[in-house]
Amino acid sequence: MKLLVIVLSSLLLTSCAGGGLSNSSENSYVSGSGAAVYIKQSDRRDAPKFSGETLTTGDLTLNSNQVTVINVWASWCAPCRAEAPLLQEFSIQYPQVQFAGVLTRDNISSAKAFYENFKLTYPTFIDDSILVGFKGSLIPNAIPTTLIIDKQGKVAVRISGEATVATLKKMLEKVTADA
């Protein structure tokens, strides 16, 4: 009986933390808590090279010698919709930083509607197999997830869940100040 209570409590807490499981094709994804993890320079891992087809601009390769914000999103994700205006605003406020999205578990027509609705101007990669290169840096199944890659091409920050103005600003300033 005690075990049953523990299991049910765990399931309840998991489903309440940041949105729980969503429906339809995205049924194995959960929203993160929004917690940001700053990784000290000596512990950072290489990020994969970003190259591939984008939602609107065709093939693209990102500059690996520039601070880069990568946002993993889907049009059906409520926290993704909530943070999209913030990411767009920051992409304009920080012209020295590259911004890019990675679409996951979504269809192109819904993603394009999302992209147009939020007037996003930064590119979004449509092949989420690029995420395999982030093994160990991404929390499996957390959408949205935002990564900040430093100038050396290493993962410096992971935000699992909806990014806030304060968190994104603090983390961007920290990473851009890194030597």
Feature-to-residue mapping (PLM):
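N-terminal post-signal-peptidase region of extra-cytosolic proteins
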Residues: 36, 71, 132-135
